[in-house]
Amino acid sequence: MKSIKWLPAFVAGLMLTACVSAPLIPAATAPTANATVPSVVTDIDDMTAVSDFAAQHDQRTLFVFDIDDTLLTAEQFFGSDYWYEWQKAKDLPNEQQVKCKFDYIALNYEAQTMKPTQADAPAIFNAVSQPKLFLTSRGGNYRGATERELHRNGYSFPSALDGSAEGRIWDWQSADDSRHSTLSYFRGVFMTSGQDKGVMLLHLLDRLQLRDRFDRVVLVDDGKANIDNMRNALAAARVPYYGFHYVRIDKPQPVNPELAEQAENDYEQSRSYLKEVFPGRYEELQAGRCAY
């Protein structure tokens, strides 16, 4: 979910000085010029498929995991990933559109608890011994709440791919300057602010000088667009790819009327709370002066 502003606490948290040496791993074996590069996408509704794949592959395999509705899922509709997809629909009636939706998402992230998409998902993730990272479309200003819920639900934070203990935060823009975001990579969580995940992963590997380290990339993600974007980017880079499209969390569109009504009621309650307790912020949001 896209955002562009940063929490001062996060910036302070990145100022770490300790470093450890990156493990020595043989360089990846590049496909020959005429070789067919594997590119396989499989629908799954159980994370055990990922652990089965991991058991058959070595340390030159990079595992990439989405967070929302892949590892964690919201316990309510309002402010969830499902709600966000509904809110950004072009045909959504004006009366159902929420002003400053990213602000309300931020408020929800801070207030809500999340749960694993399946009971054994944390154990399956933690058992993957190969290099891995969380790759999320969330922006960096959601980092504190994101890390809190991952930790609370039992997910371990992977070591940085290059072995560094330092966090990184930097500005990125596309070659044609049509897209730009602030990105961050810290505690194994790569936050990309809504950008193309395939482009972002290759960008991170280049930035860490690790493009030649891996023989293959595995992405586990509930978003078909993310699965396809990764496939396209890695095919162009001639990197073998295995995508696991995680379909366990059902998010039918259009949203049924009962769920839409529930979201509208929750939104009104949130607005009433802000108006009573934090009137200054309420007025900012009502005026469309979005902070995120």
State where each predicted segment sits:
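Short, conserved catalytic or interaction motifs in soluble domains
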Residues: S21
